[in-house]
């Protein structure tokens, strides 16, 4: 049965129980009989059924309630009783069955007479007892339903129908009885569970008192209505709370609509009392008012609990008065006097109630106005109470007065000349005027008392405002902000100035009179009164005595500036306006302006705007700015254009933001200035100056009196009765006012200037605070409390003797102005002057209020009381709402006790016995729970456990405590975790990380006999390895009783933050089973811990810590409580807790910090690495600065990055302590998110579908190790592993001097390499196997990237980037898995957005341009901040799933793919000796970094697009129709169709990404605010522009600023500086040619002409460069091969094959040379020197020489390498070579394809160790020169060999 039908059934019963005719009938037939009660109930049920029959017959309600039908139904009842009941032997049984059937059909519950009159025991079972079964509960509830209807009726009728009392106590007792009646059968149970229930009246009184205080006690004398209204509303909520608690605890089987029964019964008796006893014509109004009360209760119930009074469950809502007022406003809008039947009809929307209801105030005023109208109908006259309340509460008058008092106190404590005080006064005056206008516009009678109050306060504010106008300070001020409009005549500059000023005043909440229009021709500032805005129209058009330009020099400055005033009384006016707006036809200063330095004038204009008209738009008088265009210009010549705004709104936003930024800078500037020291002499001079000023506007009679009677005295100040004259020696003469013989005009002048003079003296004293601090620090108390009397002595009001002495020690002139100030703003009460006015108003109105209130009927009182309860009871209702969320468990009892208990007990705990450092947790002070009266000890060990274990799981709006477990898992209470829906996005918050992941129920593991569940996921952060040692798993080994500590970390909704709490426990091992109950959930556990401590809601998951064997350990998690005794479940054991940690068989040794250094949720420093496991991180740059003449006078915008802390380039700067490691790791501080799962899934599915469509003909399976190592020959994008890079960790620890990276683990020649090291092979296998079940541990080395960076990123804001070196074994495992996929992504860049592998010199660049231009030429170019640091695990998982889907992986293969990829997102990072734990981001050394970054880039943009058009499926699902996109890592270009560009644009992307924690800026101008559409020619991609050539092709031109740094710094680590420089020059030639061949030719000529050492043939010719680009454009040569041939022409293969010798030869006895491919001997027969080929040797059997090739050197190394490592005496190679010679072995030199390198090496080594005379080396090398012409450099470079 639906809720409306149930409501109607209740209505039938209510009417039936209220019929006197039925009562009389039953009394007549069964009076005094045992069946009387049953018969009465049966009669009511029978009559209600008859009413239902009439209703079902579709009779109108008027017809159902007509006298005809009432008589008809009574006849049926009487007939039924006479025929079927009176003489029936089984009458009672039949009546019970009838009643039971009705209850079952109407309310789904039973009725039983046997339990009707019985007294029921408590439902709380005794020990050994059992809970009643549901059948018993249903029987009792069925009875209680009827008892409720009777008891409520009787209780309220007894209290109200007699009308003997209308007291608050009587009404609240009535409510208490009604609540008891609603639960009469269960009262013992409720009273046993809730101790506060018996004190409910006091609770309701306390709440009503608190609400009355919030209303500023305005209802004194008539507060009864508030007490009754709040009592009724709150009682309805309490009934609903108790009912839900009984249902969830299975005491009753389901909700029975108790709030409805309670409320309708209460309203029924009130209705019957008043509607039947009053005149008929007023019954309609009474019914409306009672309907208003009912609606108020139901509205509060629905807002708090998501539940109507009828009992229907709805979504839980957040309590707030605004939504409830809307409901009430909707109700009263339908009130009409035509008929009662209009009540309850469907009401219109809120917009139909009253136009302009846009705020809480408007709705409150509207409801009050309707109540006033209804009250006038009931009372016959307009209600003064409601009229006054509508203004006091609706207009927030009390709060406004309170603000005025706060401002007044601020004015007395700080300088009144401060601009912020002046503006605040203006704001309060404007607010007061608005309130006064609201009073005058009220439709009902204007409340004269309130109007008088507001007017009085306004007069005082205006007096204060006028008094501080002349208080402008002669001190440093904020520089005003100047806005300058320029443009031709007639473009509407004046209009935009006026609109800009009006908008600024509105935004700053200032009145329209705060604008001063400056007349440039007036030498005086006539009319200037420190207005906030100054405007200049036609600035500089007409020269005056002082030009406008010259005037601005002093006005727009931070120096004090006194303006010229015509009136003597206004002399000393200082300028401190905040905004200057000028309009002029001239952009520059007038040459005749007298400004000698035009730049000084120009830089004072903060924003310069040129106004012009749009050609295609006509002028609209209604919107004069609509046809204007605004161009933002530089303020200085040549006035370059900065931006263009097409609308006024855009301009206004820019100007206001610029203004606020300017004000903030000025505020910081003023706060940095020192406070000047002032002397007494200066103070006296200032006081004389004040006297001169006050004398200037004092009446002549006062001045003349001083001259005649007080020689040497100065007029100082006056009060209402006295005039004070001051002598320079300090004396003050007091003259009564009547002696002055002043006329009325003079007295008015004295009165008007009195306050102004007093404030000037007060400000002067504040400027000299060190002379007499008392007058400054205690001025507020002295003035407000009137502690100085008219005779300038301490008054009787000052009772403190010490303070009296201090006041009397003040100079008399100070006492004089303090006394005068008291006369203006003193208050006799502790409250301020303004609130005291409110008290006077209340006092004057109280008697009339009480007189009127006596005539109010009860419905009107209840209506007003319930409405005020909603306005003022928000805190109470929020508390009740918090109880609703926990009413399903035992913690409800404790929570209810804390809310319903009045007052608080004093804790009797010992003071803490540890210092404060131990009582902070995550930078928050720990709140102590003093349960046992002991001081808890929270030591370092417990803090470590809490820090690493305690976490919070956030599921939508719910939060629960969980405990991090070893590995990637957490423990939590099962009754919460099991309820989390599958597939929702949740967040795990620890002290260091925030991780979003999708909940998978399959990963939740339950343990037998435990309430704790374990959730394991590879997405979770990894807990410390040592955590498992801090868990105690064996409950049996614990003592029976032991002390413990209870630790929680819960979110406090009031404080809006997490609060740590700690308490002492005395734990016991339980001897009986525990049944954990949560809603329908039941779970019995036999093993648990108990402690008699009253835990509260949200404690589940709290940590129970105890000292075990001298060490603090976690013994359990809190899982349940019955309000008095808590229970904890022991920590369950899981085999995965002891999974071996570390990378393969290596376990890093480090000292773990007790408190890690947290950089953010995604990264923390966890400890210091042991010395034996520490590796060096470099620190020396490979860049060499070239000689100055080599730099060719080209600018250098980039220099080498900072590699180590303490770089000399930063010495003496603010960045001297810059640490590149510490700062670089901050990029991993926080992952992006959260991502909505459905949208993310849809986006990833669409990308995977695109892959499938493009995958035809591609293999995706894994490759073997050989292919992963060597690549596949002649297969594009299948390159070999780069062996010159680092081998990673831990292999780096084993590297010996002279050994190189990965190469030392590889043997063979390129293309045929193999790994023979067993450790590497075993580690590769380990990664492949362990990743099938879990995420492997990964140790990575962080190195600072040695690169050239912009100067600002090196000197001003150092931002060195980190490069991450991953283990070689892991990289190979990844290559085996993904190499085919990488090739697919790079190969299909023609259809995929990812452009990795693009050749910018080929036609591929043009294809990118054409793809983008297909959607139009509106392109977004984005740049991300810390892109490789924010990759979240949830997206890495999605990428892994997408790969698995396209490959077709299942089961273990899918898990392996996911875990391998997640390993790089969750790793250990080694930064020198500091070890970091990183939980997001992607390391730069990951083999798939650029691919994954590209996919992430694509996902982010498509996800943003999907969310942008989430509700528009026709656009949302067709990304490629409206958008074209290319990505390369974090670079992207997004071409957007014009059809959607208004919505999907740069502003949307910036804001959307910001919500995900991602900062996006313009990719071209990274300092620009926002992202705007660009044309393709203006876009950057891979630092290249798009240039369209004459033939229609496109070139990727690189900006020249990226080229010139190559002339300043070269990388010469592997080659000589000159060789590297030549290579850089050739690279510059290639790039310059793309932009202009002429520039390339000019650059080549310049290099040759200025650098004589550069041989022309070593530079590429222009024709060679042109040929190179032609070949690239036509795709004839791969890019790398073409570059290699161009730059190393002498290394090209011989024209005739076989020209170089390749066979093994014995060139001397025992000396052999050979080539790799043609050697057929046995290496065991030789001592081998292997040239460039990786080969491992046994000790004493040879060595290898690995070197970089020199440019054009015939396969030999550079000259520097030969000199240092071959020819130099005592070098390592010579030593190893001599050892081989001394053993008498045959010596074999072997090189790769030819014997020539081996031959030359052999000769040079023999000569260097003196085994070969110079003559023979000459002959041998000359022979080699004859065979290989490329060795022609040898005689020149090595003359000692010839």
Curated annotation (Swiss-Prot):
Pinpoint the site Cleavage.
318-319, 908-909, 934-935, 1143-1144
Of the GO CC terms on this record, one is:
host cell perinuclear region of cytoplasm
Q: Which InterPro entries match?
A: DNA/RNA_pol_sf, Helic/Pol/Pept_Calicivir-typ, Helicase_SF3_ssDNA/RNA_vir, Helicase_SF3_ssRNA_vir, PCV_3C_PRO, Peptidase_C3A/C3B_picornavir, Peptidase_S1_PA, Peptidase_S1_PA_chymotrypsin
Q: Ranges for the SF3 helicase domain? A: 458-626
Q: Its catalytic activity? A: RNA(n) + a ribonucleoside 5'-triphosphate = RNA(n+1) + diphosphate
Instruction: List the GO biological process terms.
Output: DNA-templated transcription; proteolysis; viral RNA genome replication
Alphabetically sorted, this entry's keywords are: ATP-binding, Covalent protein-RNA linkage, Helicase, Host cytoplasm, Host endoplasmic reticulum, Host membrane, Hydrolase, Membrane, Nucleotide-binding, Nucleotidyltransferase, Phosphoprotein, Protease, RNA-directed RNA polymerase, Thiol protease, Transferase, Transmembrane, Transmembrane helix, Viral RNA replication
Gene3D superfamilies given in the database record: 3.30.70.270, Trypsin-like serine proteases
Alphabetical list of SUPFAM superfamilies matching this protein:
DNA/RNA polymerases, Trypsin-like serine proteases
**What are the transmembrane regions?**
883-903
Query: What residues sit in the active site?
Result: 975 (for picornain 3c-like protease activity), 1011 (for picornain 3c-like protease activity), 1100 (for picornain 3c-like protease activity)
Any idea where the RdRp catalytic domain is?
A: 1417-1544
Under the GO molecular function aspect, what terms does this record hold? ATP binding; cysteine-type endopeptidase activity; RNA binding; RNA helicase activity; RNA-directed RNA polymerase activity
Record-given protein name: RNA1 polyprotein
Top-down, what is the taxonomic lineage of the species of origin?
Answer: Viruses, Riboviria, Orthornavirae, Pisuviricota, Pisoniviricetes
């Amino acid at each position: 049965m639906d809720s409306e039908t149930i409501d109607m059934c209740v209505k039938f019963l209510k009417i039936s129980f209220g019929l006197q005719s039925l009562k009389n009938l039953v009394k007549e037939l069964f009076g005094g009989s045992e069946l009387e009660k049953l018969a009465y109930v049966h009669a009511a049920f029978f009559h209600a059924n008859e009413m239902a029959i009439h209703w079902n017959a579709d009779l109108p309600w008027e017809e159902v309630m007509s006298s005809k039908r009432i008589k008809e139904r009574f006849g049926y009842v009487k007939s039924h009783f006479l025929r079927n009941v009176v003489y029936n032997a089984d009458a009672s049984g039949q009546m019970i069955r009838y009643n039971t059937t009705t209850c079952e059909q109407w309310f789904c519950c039973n009725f039983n007479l046997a339990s009707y009159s019985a007294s029921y025991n408590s439902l709380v079972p005794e020990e050994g007892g059992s809970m009643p079964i549901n059948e018993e509960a249903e029987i009792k509830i069925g009875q209680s339903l009827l008892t409720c209807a009777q008891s409520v009726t009787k209780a309220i009728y007894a209290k109200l129908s007699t009308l003997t009392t209308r007291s608050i106590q009587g009404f609240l007792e009535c409510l208490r009885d009604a609540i008891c009646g609603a639960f009469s059968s269960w009262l013992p149970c409720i009273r046993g569970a809730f101790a506060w229930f018996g004190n409910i009246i006091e609770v309701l009184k306390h709440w009503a008192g608190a609400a009355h205080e919030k209303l500023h006690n305005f209802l004194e004398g008539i507060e009864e209505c508030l007490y009754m209204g709040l009592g009724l509303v709150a009682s309805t909520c309490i009934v609903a709370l108790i009912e839900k608690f009984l249902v969830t605890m299975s005491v009753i089987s389901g909700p029975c609509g108790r709030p409805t029964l309670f409320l309708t019964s209460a309203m029924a008796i009130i209705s019957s009392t008043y509607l039947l006893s009053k005149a008929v014509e007023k019954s309609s109004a009474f019914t409306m008012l009672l309907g208003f009360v009912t609606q108020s209760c139901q509205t509060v119930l629905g807002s708090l609990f998501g539940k109507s009074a009828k009992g229907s469950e709805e979504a839980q809502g957040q309590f707030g008065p605004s939504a409830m007022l809307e409901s009430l406003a909707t109700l009263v809008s339908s009130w009409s006097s035509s008929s009662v039947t209009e009540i309850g009809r469907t009401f219109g929307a809120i917009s139909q109630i009253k136009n302009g209801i846009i705020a809480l105030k408007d709705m409150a005023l509207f409801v009050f106005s309707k109540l006033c109208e209804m009250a006038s109908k009931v009372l016959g006259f307009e209600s003064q109470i409601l009229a006054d309340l509508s203004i006091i509460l609706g207009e927030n008058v009390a709060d406004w007065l309170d603000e005025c008092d706060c401002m007044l106190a601020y004015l007395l404590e700080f300088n009144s000349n401060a601009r912020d005080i002046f503006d605040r006064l203006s704001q309060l005056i404007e607010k007061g005027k608005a309130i006064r206008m609201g009073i005058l516009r009220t439709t009902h009678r204007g409340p004269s008392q309130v109007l008088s109050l507001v007017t009085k306060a306004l007069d005082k504010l205006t007096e204060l405002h006028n008094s501080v106008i002349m208080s402008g300070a002669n001190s440093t001020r904020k520089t005003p902000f100047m806005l300058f409009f320029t443009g031709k005549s007639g473009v509407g500059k004046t209009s935009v100035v006026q609109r800009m000023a009006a908008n600024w005043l509105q935004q700053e909440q200032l009145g329209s009179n705060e604008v001063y229009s400056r007349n440039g021709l007036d030498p005086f500032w006539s009319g200037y009164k420190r207005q906030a805005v100054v405007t200049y129209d036609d600035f500089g058009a007409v020269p005056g005595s002082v030009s406008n330009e010259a005037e601005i020099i002093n006005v727009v400055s931070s120096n004090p500036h006194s303006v010229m005033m015509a009136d003597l009384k206004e002399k000393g006016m200082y300028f401190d306006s905040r905004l200057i707006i000028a309009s002029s036809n001239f952009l520059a200063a007038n040459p005749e302006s007298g400004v000698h330095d035009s730049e000084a004038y120009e830089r004072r204009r903060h924003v310069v705007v040129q106004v012009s008209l749009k050609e295609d738009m006509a002028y609209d008088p209604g919107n004069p700015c609509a046809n204007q265009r605004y161009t933002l210009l530089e303020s200085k010549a040549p006035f370059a254009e900065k931006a263009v705004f097409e609308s006024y709104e855009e301009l206004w936003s820019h100007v206001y933001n610029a203004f606020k930024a300017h004000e903030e800078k000025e505020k910081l500037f003023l706060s940095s200035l020192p406070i000047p020291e002032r002397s007494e002499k200066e103070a006296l001079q200032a006081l004389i100056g004040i006297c001169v000023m006050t004398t200037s506007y004092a009446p002549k009679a006062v001045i003349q009196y001083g001259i005649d009677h007080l020689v040497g005295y100065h007029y100082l100040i006056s009060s209402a009765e006295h005039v004070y004259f001051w002598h320079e020696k300090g004396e003050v003469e007091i003259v009564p006012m009547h002696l002055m013989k002043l006329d009325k005009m003079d007295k008015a002048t004295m009165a008007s200037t009195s306050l102004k003079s007093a404030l000037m003296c007060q400000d002067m004293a504040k400027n000299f605070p060190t002379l007499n601090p008392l007058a400054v620090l205690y001025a507020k108390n002295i003035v407000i409390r009137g502690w100085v009397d008219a005779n300038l002595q301490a008054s009787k009001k000052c009772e403190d003797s010490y303070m009296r002495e201090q006041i009397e020690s003040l100079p008399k002139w100070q006492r004089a102005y303090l006394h005068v100030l008291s006369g203006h703003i003193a208050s006799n009460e502790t409250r301020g002057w303004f609130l005291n006015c409110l008290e006077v108003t209340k006092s004057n109105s109280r008697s009339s209020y009480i007189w009127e209130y006596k005539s109010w009927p009860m419905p009107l009182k209840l209506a007003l009381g319930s409405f005020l309860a909603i306005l003022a009871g928000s805190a109470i209702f929020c508390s009740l709402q918090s109880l609703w969320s926990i009413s399903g468990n035992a913690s409800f009892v404790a929570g209810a006790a804390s809310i319903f208990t009045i007052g608080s007990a004093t804790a009797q705990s010992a003071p803490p016995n540890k210092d404060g450092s131990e009582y902070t947790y995550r930078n928050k002070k720990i709140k102590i729970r003093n349960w046992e009266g002991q001081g808890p000890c929270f030591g370092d060990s417990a803090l470590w456990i809490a820090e690493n274990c305690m976490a919070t799981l956030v599921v939508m709006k719910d939060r629960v405590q969980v405990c991090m477990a070893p590995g990637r898992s957490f423990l939590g209470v099962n009754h919460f975790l099991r309820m989390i829906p599958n597939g929702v996005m949740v967040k795990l918050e620890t002290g260091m990380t925030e991780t979003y992941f999708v909940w998978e129920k399959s990963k939740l593991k339950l343990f037998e006999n435990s309430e704790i569940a374990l959730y394991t996921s590879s997405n979770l952060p990894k807990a410390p390895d040592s955590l498992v040692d801090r868990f105690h798993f064996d409950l049996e080994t614990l003592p029976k009783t032991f002390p413990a500590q209870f630790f929680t970390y819960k979110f406090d909704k009031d404080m809006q933050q997490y609060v740590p709490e700690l308490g002492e426990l005395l734990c016991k091992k339980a001897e009986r089973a525990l049944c954990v109950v949560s809603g329908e959930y039941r779970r019995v556990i036999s093993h648990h811990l108990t402690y008699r401590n009253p835990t509260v809601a949200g404690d589940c998951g709290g940590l129970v810590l105890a000292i075990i064997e001298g060490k603090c350990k976690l013994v359990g998690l809190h899982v349940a409580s019955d309000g008095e005794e808590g229970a904890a479940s022991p920590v369950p054991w899981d085999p995965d807790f002891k999974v071996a940690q570390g990378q393969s068989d290596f376990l890093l040794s480090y000292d773990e910090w007790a408190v890690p250094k947290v950089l953010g949720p995604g990264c923390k420093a966890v400890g210091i690495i042991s010395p034996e496991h520490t590796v060096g991180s470099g620190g020396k740059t490979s860049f060499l600065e070239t000689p100055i003449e080599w730099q060719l006078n080209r600018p250098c915008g980039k220099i080498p990055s900072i590699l180590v802390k303490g770089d000399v380039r930063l010495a003496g700067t603010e960045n001297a302590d810059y640490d590149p490691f510490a700062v670089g790791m901050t990029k991993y501080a926080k992952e992006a998110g959260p991502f909505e799962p459905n949208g993310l899934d849809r986006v990833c599915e669409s990308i995977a579908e695109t892959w499938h469509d493009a995958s035809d003909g591609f293999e995706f399976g894994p490759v073997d190790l050989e292919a992963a190592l060597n690549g596949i020959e002649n297969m594009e994008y299948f390159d070999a592993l780069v062996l010159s890079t680092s081998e990673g960790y831990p292999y780096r620890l084993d590297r010996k001097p002279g050994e190189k990276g990965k190469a030392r683990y590889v043997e063979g020649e390129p293309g045929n390499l193999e790994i023979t090291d067993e450790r590497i092979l075993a580690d590769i296998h380990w990664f492949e196997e362990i990743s099938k079940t879990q995420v492997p541990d990964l140790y990575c080395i962080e190195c600072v990237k040695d690169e050239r960076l912009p100067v600002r990123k090196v000197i001003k804001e150092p931002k060195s980037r980190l490069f991450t070196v991953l283990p070689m074994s892991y990289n190979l495992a990844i290559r085996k898995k993904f190499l085919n996929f990488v090739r697919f992504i790079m190969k299909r860049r023609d259809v995929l957005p990812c452009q990795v592998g693009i050749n910018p010199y080929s036609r591929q660049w043009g294809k990118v341009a054409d793809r983008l231009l297909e959607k139009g030429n509106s392109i977004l170019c984005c740049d991300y901040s810390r892109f490789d640091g924010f990759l979240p695990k949830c997206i890495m998982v999605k990428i892994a799933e997408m790969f698995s889907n396209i490959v077709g992986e299942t089961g273990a293969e899918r898990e392996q793919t996911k875990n391998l990829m997640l390993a790089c997102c969750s790793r250990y990072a080694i930064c020198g000796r500091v070890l970091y734990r990183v939980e997001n981001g992607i390391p730069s050394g990951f083999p798939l970094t650029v691919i994954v970054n590209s996919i992430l880039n694509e996902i982010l943009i498509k996800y943003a697009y999907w969310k942008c058009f989430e509700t528009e499926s026709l656009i949302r699902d067709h990304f490629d129709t409206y958008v074209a996109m290319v990505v390369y890592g974090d670079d992207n270009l997004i071409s957007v169709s014009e059809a959607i560009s208004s919505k999907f644009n740069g502003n949307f992307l910036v804001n959307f990404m910001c919500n995900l924690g991602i900062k996006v800026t313009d990719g071209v101008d990274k300092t620009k605010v926002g992202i705007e559409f660009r044309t393709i020619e203006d876009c950057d991609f891979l630092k290249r522009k798009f240039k369209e050539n004459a033939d229609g092709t496109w070139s990727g031109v690189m900006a020249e600023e990226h080229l010139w740094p190559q002339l300043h710094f070269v990388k010469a680590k592997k080659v000589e500086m000159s060789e590297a420089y030549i290579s850089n020059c050739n690279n510059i030639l290639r790039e310059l040619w793309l932009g202009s061949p002429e520039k390339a030719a000019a650059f080549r000529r310049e290099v040759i002409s200025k650098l004589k050492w550069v041989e022309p043939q070593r530079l590429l010719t222009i024709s060679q460069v042109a040929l190179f680009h032609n070949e690239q454009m036509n795709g004839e040569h791969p890019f790398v091969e073409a570059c290699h041939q161009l730059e190393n022409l002498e290394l090209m293969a011989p024209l005739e094959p076989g020209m170089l010798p390749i066979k093994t030869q014995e060139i001397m006895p025992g000396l052999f040379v050979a080539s790799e491919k043609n050697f057929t001997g046995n290496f065991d027969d030789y001592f081998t020197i292997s040239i460039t080929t990786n080969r491992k040797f046994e000790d004493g059997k040879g060595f290898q020489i690995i070197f970089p090739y020199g440019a054009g050197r015939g396969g030999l190394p550079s000259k520097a390498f030969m000199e240092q490592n071959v020819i130099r005496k005592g070098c390592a190679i010579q030593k190893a070579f001599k050892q081989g010679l001394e053993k008498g072995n045959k010596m074999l030199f072997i090189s790769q394809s030819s014997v020539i390198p081996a031959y030359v090496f052999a000769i040079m080594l023999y000569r260097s160790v003196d085994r070969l005379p110079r003559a023979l080396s000459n002959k041998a090398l000359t022979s080699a020169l004859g065979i290989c012409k490329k060795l022609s450099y040898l005689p020149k470079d090595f003359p000692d060999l010839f």
